Amino acid sequence: MLLPGNAGAQSANAPSSIYTPKTQPQPQPLRVEVIDGTRFRDIETRTVYRLYGIEACAPDQTARLGRQPWPCGAMAVAWLVTATLNRWLACGSVRAEGDEQLVRCATAGHADLAADMLHDGVAVLAPLAPDDLKIPSYAAAQADARKAYRGLWSSTFEMPWDWRTRRDRQSALDNEVRR
């Protein structure tokens, strides 16, 4: 039945007795290979995607639970591999950034990969630029993980962006010394 007020949503070539909504074409589902804790590559197109709004430890970064170091970067990679291995991903693009697509993605087991990573404490909220979309459920997921001392929040760790900056600075200094 065609309801009044829905005529604007009617497809141009559909008979007037049949309602057909105008919809955006859905992106094709992806099969991916994980690059690091927030990035993966489509195995067919080789396009690189990065989860929007979060950061995870670098693959070689560690955290410390008491006196015990643990590989928080490897854990983030393992979490993302487990969530995506042999599963189709449905991703919506937020924007392109360099040669990567910033995306929000879901699988059959995860309504929002980034939110679930935050909830499990394997990722943290990324610093957002002023014009970036803030996602309240992401902040709530991180607050929940932090309150429950899940994952990173049970440990001492350096924020991933600070760790990468320090590592890059140290690497540059090491290269200068070698010259």
Region annotations inferred by a language model:
Residues 3-179:
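Small beta-barrel nucleic-acid-binding modules, primarily SNase/OB-fold domains
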